[in-house]
Amino acid sequence: MPDTTGGHPAALKVVTLDGPAGVGKTTLARRVADALGIPYLDTGAMFRTMAWRLGPDGPDLDEALLRDRLAGFVFTLRGRGGASVLSCNGEDIGNEIRTEEVGAMASRIAALPVVRECLKAAQQRMGAAQPLVVEGRDMGTVVFPGARHKFFLDAAPEIRAMRRYTQLQTMGEAHDLALLTEQIRSRDEQDRNRAVAPLRPAADAIIVDTGDLDIDGVFGVIMQHIRSRDGL
């Protein structure tokens, strides 16, 4: 497998957007990919897909059995910009993975080194093959530390919970806002304090507080930094 963890040229063509749940990573990553004309990779969807397919008992599987199960997942990416489509074993990934239940399971399996090792290899293969806009929680720190453009998006838990609440309403799901806020705080705690690849900004990442900006404002900040550095 090509080394994309350091100075590999392919890593320089990657734009990373990291941050906790609810900061707008998905929407922004799609827009940036559209603007740059390159594929977009939602790594959170990869974790959610694994969690959904492994089921509630996935995190408790014996490591050897889990490793064997993980070897059966093959992710592929096609298309460009926001229209990029991620597939697993030939099946396009849909909204079935976007529930709060699957999100909670994904956070659990994301703490397992064997899972992160498997997905890191898959993500690096994609980044070695083509330029990418990639979103996640450790893209700029662990998966693509040599990426040319790194951004870390953040906002207060209350703001992120409201955004998630609105998003779920549009999907026809009813949720309690106070409970969503508590779930986001709990997931933040878990993601920031896990032993493997904790959620944190890369030392050279541009940190953007999305709480006081709308999507257009954050998009403008990101594109300004990219164009300035690349002389566009």
UniProtKB/Swiss-Prot annotation:
Coiled-coil regions, chain positions: none
GO MF term list: ATP binding; CMP kinase activity; dCMP kinase activity
This protein's record includes keyword Nucleotide-binding: yes
EC number, as in UniProt: 2.7.4.25
Catalysis: reaction(s): CMP + ATP = CDP + ADP; dCMP + ATP = dCDP + ADP
InterPro entries in alphabetical order: Cytidylate_kin, Cytidylate_kinase_dom, P-loop_NTPase
GO cellular component: cytosol
Annotated HAMAP family: Cytidyl_kinase_type1
Name of this protein: Cytidylate kinase
Organism, as annotated: Nitratidesulfovibrio vulgaris (strain ATCC 29579 / DSM 644 / CCUG 34227 / NCIMB 8303 / VKM B-1760 / Hildenborough)
